[in-house]
């Protein structure tokens, strides 16, 4: 039986071989395929933390926990030593202020100066805002995550168990429109929680590995809150691409053999979806190949 990570490696190889060369928003350029699907079985405790390169899984889980707070400012992320969202506010600050500040100096200023953080660390109404405080036309805020968990508990056969972040009225105010847009859930007759994540845009080398981990961690938390066990995680990509400055790294990764996937488990049952902390997650048996460095396209 093929290693489940081989699906991802095959997608890298297909993109390298058949990807359509395109000029993109960032100016870097991409090789792009449209429409991809991967399926991972989480029922045995294994999770899709790639082994053909080191994935910093704690960073991905911390990001997911930040989404669940409804946060839209990078300061709490920086306080957790998570820097994956700094590029966009940094670019905005440089553009508007004219100051050629380093990323490290910018992040330090965000950490030390609350007023500066409030002005320049803000990302706009990104994921967490839409997940937890979607503003309706009547002024009422909708908590999509709470509604999802309540439906899982009370009507698990529903086909309406999803949440998304593509708020048309607010997309233009976001530092980056949502890439991982829609999360849909499905409960089997024997109590397994399946999840489907749709991404409209996929940075295959850097973004997708983090999205796999975040979605799996979220599935574990939601399953626990609803009294279910994790099942399949289905990942669907729209514009699935490799940036042209990531091609050598992708070739290197496809030449590596996958190792046994690690297991992720929750160390306690949190009182609610809002009460999980990074210390609640344990990953066991993770033995990856070395990390592969690559630049983020902004």
From Swiss-Prot:
It catalyses: dUMP + (6R)-5,10-methylene-5,6,7,8-tetrahydrofolate = 7,8-dihydrofolate + dTMP. Pfam families: Thymidylat_synt. Its EC number is 2.1.1.45. InterPro entries: Thymidate_synth/dCMP_Mease, Thymidate_synth/dCMP_Mease_dom, Thymidate_synth/dCMP_Mease_sf, Thymidylate_synthase, Thymidylate_synthase_AS. Keywords: Cytoplasm, Methyltransferase, Nucleotide biosynthesis, Transferase. The active site is at residue 179. GO terms for cellular component: cytosol. CDD domains: TS_Pyrimidine_HMase. Gene3D superfamilies: Thymidylate synthase/dCMP hydroxymethylase domain. One of its GO terms (molecular function) is thymidylate synthase activity. Signal peptide: none annotated. Catalyzes the reductive methylation of 2'-deoxyuridine-5'-monophosphate (dUMP) to 2'-deoxythymidine-5'-monophosphate (dTMP) while utilizing 5,10-methylenetetrahydrofolate (mTHF) as the methyl donor and reductant in the reaction, yielding dihydrofolate (DHF) as a by-product. This enzymatic reaction provides an intracellular de novo source of dTMP, an essential precursor for DNA biosynthesis. This is Thymidylate synthase.
């Amino acid at each position: 039986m093929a290693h489940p990570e081989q699906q991802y490696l095959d997608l890298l190889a297909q993109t390298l071989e058949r990807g359509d060369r395109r000029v993109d928003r960032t100016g870097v350029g991409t090789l792009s395929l449209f429409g991809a699907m991967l399926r991972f079985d989480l029922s045995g405790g294994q999770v899709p933390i790639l082994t053909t390169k080191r994935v910093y899984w704690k960073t991905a889980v911390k990001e997911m926990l930040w989404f669940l707070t409804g946060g839209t400012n990078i300061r709490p992320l920086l306080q957790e030593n998570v820097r994956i969202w700094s590029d966009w506010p940094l670019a905005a600050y440089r553009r508007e202020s004219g100051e050629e500040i380093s990323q490290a100096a910018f992040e330090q200023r965000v950490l030390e100066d609350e007023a500066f953080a409030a002005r320049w660390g803000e990302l706009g109404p990104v994921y967490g805002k839409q997940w937890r405080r979607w503003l309706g036309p009547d002024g009422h805020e909708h908590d999509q995550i709470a509604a999802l968990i309540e439906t899982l508990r009370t009507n698990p056969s529903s086909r309406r168990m999803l949440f998304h972040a593509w708020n048309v009225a607010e997309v233009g105010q976001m530092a980056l429109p949502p890439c991982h847009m829609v999360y849909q859930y499905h409960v089997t007759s024997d109590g397994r929680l399946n999840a489907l994540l749709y991404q409209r845009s996929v940075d295959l080398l850097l973004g997708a590995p983090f999205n796999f981990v975040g979605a799996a961690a979220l599935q574990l938390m939601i399953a626990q809150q609803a009294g279910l066990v994790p099942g399949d995680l289905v990942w669907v990509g729209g514009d699935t691409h490799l940036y042209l400055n990531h091609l050598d790294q992708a070739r290197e990764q496809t030449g590596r053999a996958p190792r046994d996937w690690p297991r992720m488990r929750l160390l306690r049952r949190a009182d609610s979806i809002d009460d999980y902390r990074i210390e609640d997650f344990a990953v066991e048996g993770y033995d990856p190949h070395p990390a592969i460095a690559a630049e983020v396209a902004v």
